[in-house]
Amino acid sequence: MVVAKPTAAVSIEDLIKKHSDVDPFLVKKWERIFSLFFDRNASHQVDWGDFYLVVKKVRDIYGAESVQTGFAKKSLAALWEGLCSIADADKDQLISIDEWIGLLKKTDAKTEPKWFKDYQNFMFKLFDVSCDGVMDLAEYTDGMSTYGFDQSECDAAFHKFSVDKKGQYVPQMKPETWNTYFHQLFYSTNKSDVGNHLFGIIDF
């Protein structure tokens, strides 16, 4: 296993300049996703160790023998292999922030790739502890705690995005709605789309 070595932090301003062909709002969102959900050891590169830290946290929260832990082990291993096969340009078993942005900007948002759909489905199933096909605030909060979010942050975010077309709060979210918001989070340049706040309220 290759272990990521700490590298100099890349500022968001530098990333925006380097990837000037991408909307700055998307670059900011992509960097946030990379830092919060993939680069768990803050090395500015993603390796299998980052994914293992997520599995370990899932185990701590849900239990070693839980459905969530077994699902996380299986799904994250497959996701890592999939990401490496298409994003790891220099084949060093490390995915840098530039490789991550490069992967996303060459992805056709209209035809989501397998790794994207796998990640989208993994996150919903991880959160849906009761396996009833819908997600509520308590499940969302437990899932987000895997990534270090506290209850107040989760409550604010869930009430922000779990709404109907009239803006009224909806206490449970279906997979179809989750998928729409997940797509908005990754690819929408419209700052008013509620999917931008799917993994915590953003203020940029």
Swiss-Prot record:
PROSITE patterns: EF_HAND_1 (PS00018), EF_HAND_2 (PS50222). Gene3D superfamilies: EF-hand. GO terms for molecular function: calcium ion binding. Ca(2+) 1 binds at residues 39, 41, 43, 45, 50. It comes from the Eukaryota. Residues 25-61, 75-110, 115-150 form the EF-hand domain. InterPro entries: EF-hand-dom_pair, EF_Hand_1_Ca_BS, EF_hand_dom. Keywords: Calcium, Metal-binding, Repeat. Ca(2+) 2 binds at residues 88, 90, 92, 99. Ca(2+) 3 binds at residues 128, 130, 132, 139. This is Calexcitin-1. It comes from Caenorhabditis elegans.
